[in-house]
Swiss-Prot record:
TM region(s), chain numbering: 10-32
Alphabetically ordered keywords of this record: Membrane, Transmembrane, Transmembrane helix
GO CC terms of this entry: membrane
Miscellaneous note of the record: Partially overlaps RRN5.
Stated name of the protein: Putative uncharacterized protein YLR140W
Subcellular location: Membrane
Membrane topology: Single-pass membrane protein
Length: 108
């Protein structure tokens, strides 16, 4: 017996698609959950704002990012000055990131 459930939640500007799968084999139940993020149909301005928030959250997971003073290491591929918008009210400022080159491409 295989039961497949789909749950879709709209989180602008992306659609968060979560699939729940229940598999029963010889009276044993196996539960699986898959999550996929797809682009939604919101405006480009909202998408950009959301991407910046995502990047901030992603960078916050890395120890090189201190959240206040920029990044503590100077390893951003071949360049020493990397830029990122810290909040919607700030301007683009030079920042130094340890793993920026590997994080940013998936949000562009």
């Amino acid at each position: 017996m295989l039961t497949l459930y789909f749950l879709q939640c709209l989180q602008a500007p992306y659609i968060l698609c979560t699939s729940f799968i229940t598999l029963k084999i010889h009276n044993f139940f196996f539960f699986f959950q898959f999550t996929e993020i797809r682009k939604g149909g919101r405006g480009e301005k909202q998408k950009k704002k959301y991407r910046e928030t995502e990047v901030e959250e992603e960078l916050g997971k890395h120890s090189a990012y201190d959240g206040h003073l920029g990044w503590s290491t100077n390893n951003c591929g071949s360049t020493s000055n990397c830029t990122i918008r810290r909040s919607r009210n700030s301007t683009m400022v030079p920042r130094q990131a340890a793993q920026l080159s590997s994080i940013l491409p998936k949000y562009m």
